[in-house]
Amino acid sequence: MIVERIWTGNAYRNFNYLIACPETGEALAIDPLDHEKTLATARVKGWQITQVLNTHEHHDHTGGNAAVIAATGAKLIAHHKAGGRIAGVDRGVKAGDVIKVGKTVELECLDTPGHTMCHICLRSHTEQPALFSGDTLFNAGAGNVHNGGDVNALYATFAEQLARLPDDTLVYPGHDYIENNLRFTLAREPDNAAAKALLPSVTDHDPAKSAVTTLKDEKEFNTFLRLSSPSVIARLRESFPDLPDEPDARTVFAKLRELRNQW
């Protein structure tokens, strides 16, 4: 499996992705908003885009569909309930469905509601797994629930699915928010050594050259994966004095998301 991360450089700070089979040159485009860069990258690599996948229905992820499909004839894949939200879906997928790219690439669909209720992530069937997480899991952060989402569903996705993936899973999110997210981590957990160590290298960085994190890394500096941290809970109580002495993880997650909305 070959992964090509495409930095759009737009105001939304989107990443687009191409996943290619090294044997056949067939490729899957994930959320190809910047259709020009996506098509140009495939052309330079000698790949044929045969499928397009949208992680969810928001325009900054679907806006390049028409141009890519017109140029390549690719089939469009999305959540099985997204047909009324995304035009021209050819294949609706559910949890456990597998997307094959060429002869060698298999990507398992995870039904990951929260950011929206029609959100999917992809997990690769590779020796070192990779997670294409859309707007669910970001580097050092979590998606918002402003436009069709639900914070309890997002918590469940984190707790019941993402946190249980292997620690060596590579994380490929839909946006570059790592600098701001690390600053949020340090505001919530000032003694977080991993966040302190990483922040200088991503301050005013070039996202096109940004390092790829693993889930193990995320568990060290992503506040939304550190819900039992005494430091996180103590600082959270300063903002929410009525927080129980031993708050449950769901409550901590929801309160953190509330604070992140204002960050």
Swiss-Prot record:
Q: Which keywords belong to this entry?
A: Hydrolase, Metal-binding, Zinc
Q: Record-annotated residues binding Zn(2+) 2?
A: D60, H61, D135, H175
Q: Which SUPFAM superfamilies match?
A: Metallo-hydrolase/oxidoreductase
Which InterPro entries does UniProt cross-reference here? Clx_II_MBL, HAGH_C, Hydroxyacylglutathione_Hdrlase, Metallo-B-lactamas, RibonucZ/Hydroxyglut_hydro
Domain of life of the native organism: Bacteria
Q: Which cofactor does it need?
A: Zn(2+)
Q: Which molecular-function annotations from GO does this UniProt entry contain?
A: hydroxyacylglutathione hydrolase activity; metal ion binding
Describe which pathway this protein belongs to, using the record's wording: Secondary metabolite metabolism; methylglyoxal degradation; (R)-lactate from methylglyoxal: step 2/2
The reply to whether Oxidoreductase figures as a keyword in the UniProt entry is: no
What positions does the entry give for Zn(2+) 1 binding?
Answer: H56, H58, H115, D135
Tell me which Pfam families the record gives.
Answer: HAGH_C, Lactamase_B
Quick one: a GO biological-process term for this protein? methylglyoxal catabolic process to D-lactate via S-lactoyl-glutathione
Q: Which reaction does it catalyse?
A: an S-(2-hydroxyacyl)glutathione + H2O = a 2-hydroxy carboxylate + glutathione + H(+)
How many cofactors are bound and how? Binds 2 Zn(2+) ions per subunit.
- Report the EC number(s), separated by commas if there are several: 3.1.2.6
What is this protein's function?
Thiolesterase that catalyzes the hydrolysis of S-D-lactoyl-glutathione to form glutathione and D-lactic acid.
Which family is this sequence assigned to?
Answer: Belongs to the metallo-beta-lactamase superfamily. Glyoxalase II family.
Question: What is said about its interaction partners and assembly?
Answer: Monomer.
Name of protein = Hydroxyacylglutathione hydrolase
Organism equals Polaromonas sp. (strain JS666 / ATCC BAA-500)
